[in-house]
Amino acid sequence: DITPVQVKSVEQQALQGLHRIRSLWMGTRTSRINALRGFCREFGIAIAAGSRTGVENISRVLADPNSAVPEMIRGTLKLLIEEIRLMEARIAQIERELTQVAKDSDACKLLLSIPGVGLLTSTAMVAATSGKVTHFKDARHFASWFGLTPKEYSSGNSRRLGRISKKGDR
């Protein structure tokens, strides 16, 4: 038996595309921040974790002519900071677009009324299902399909369940 699947509308595909692009840009931003922190560590400068404070601290270090960062690499590190800020602006733009989608969608409004469901979860659910979950046998099947099941860590006879996997609909 082959289980039939619902075909996504063009709007659902576009909304899902926004989520995927946002995720891609988040990964790019994180990669750049980690690279910056790594370069600073190589020159003996410890920068605390966290995107906002970390980037601002690195900017101050690069602006200080007496810091341990060699002049040869300062310009390139400043370009990395510009890339991070560009990614943050792009992510914010997508989040504004998602906010508008949530305001215009009755299904999103209903989902947002549930405690613990925010903008990203509600719009991702609408992108995945168009707000209609009647074709799922029960809530457990929907949660599993959507990726809200715990990640399993097993070894020998021990079995531990971790945080939710968030790997559904891929």
Language-model features: where?
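Proteins with a high burden of low-complexity, intrinsically disordered sequence enriched in S/T/G/P/A and R
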Residues: 1, 53-54, 170
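Phosphate-backbone recognition surface of nucleic-acid-processing proteins
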Residues: 110-170
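Short coil/loop linkers at secondary-structure junctions
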Residues: 3, 46-48, 149
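Glycine-rich, often acidic, oxyanion-interacting loops/wings at catalytic, nucleic-acid
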Residues: 10-110
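Short helix-capping/linker segments at secondary-structure and domain boundaries
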Residues: 1-3, 32-35, 91-92, 130-134
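Conserved beta-strand termini and adjacent loop/short-helix elements that scaffold enzyme active sites
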Residues: 5-7, 50, 153
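Short, polar/flexible loop-turn hinges at active-site or ligand-entry regions and domain interfaces
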Residues: 1-12
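Residue-level marker of intrinsically disordered, low-complexity segments enriched
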Residues: 3-5, 71, 112, 162
